[in-house]
């Protein structure tokens, strides 16, 4: 096992050394990677659940580059900019990074992708992950990006439609679903309209409910009550589903109101939602590192198609189902990757 680990490490170092040696010889400097994060400086771990912004974080991306043989200060330079949770700072921070003339910029979440894309049309940008609608607008063509942006998507419309279908399977009497969306997130603000055709086939009426952050929740809850909703759907938005305190507050209120919650965030079922159909965001961030590796090796953005997740984690919460008087169908239990007792 030790010999195998040594060989894997050696291969990674050799693989990365050739392009970087050529780079240094040609330019007289180390390649520079700009990293734009909506989170905090202290938020550099790569665990499945972290304290503040529980997206994949730059730590998972850096972990991916280390696995490819990159070492900050030795054969690459990382320039970080952190918004410290204030996503309105992202445009200014993206402009700062551009002024440093990095060879490639990495970012994640919809806010980071939009800010970086607006700051430069020349420097290659790798996003991973971010919402599908946002990446489609920035890259313009998934198969062969025609702009300077590529990367991996966070979720897809089809994934959320399937999650809505799972909600109906688990709670068959569901007829009115409140879709909690952040109007400040361009990837999700139109989601009630995007999901409406699929909802109609299931006999479900959707109502969009807006909330930008925890401060907006009391008003959002009042609107959900007024809508007559008998279930709730949470998109995988960093400010709502992606922040532990806000997510748990939403789920506690939903349980008190006896509303089953479905979400495309893999963390929701674990915290008391009924069902989640989510992605492994840490793996997607590590995948984004391979894009940066290829760009530093000479690849053009147009040669790097945008990738969509190919696997999803289905989680169902049996405790929540019991509290709501629901029985999880055996076929759903058989398909589930995780059953929370």
Predicted features and spans:
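Short hydrophobic alpha-helices and adjacent helix-cap/hinge residues
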Residues: 1-341
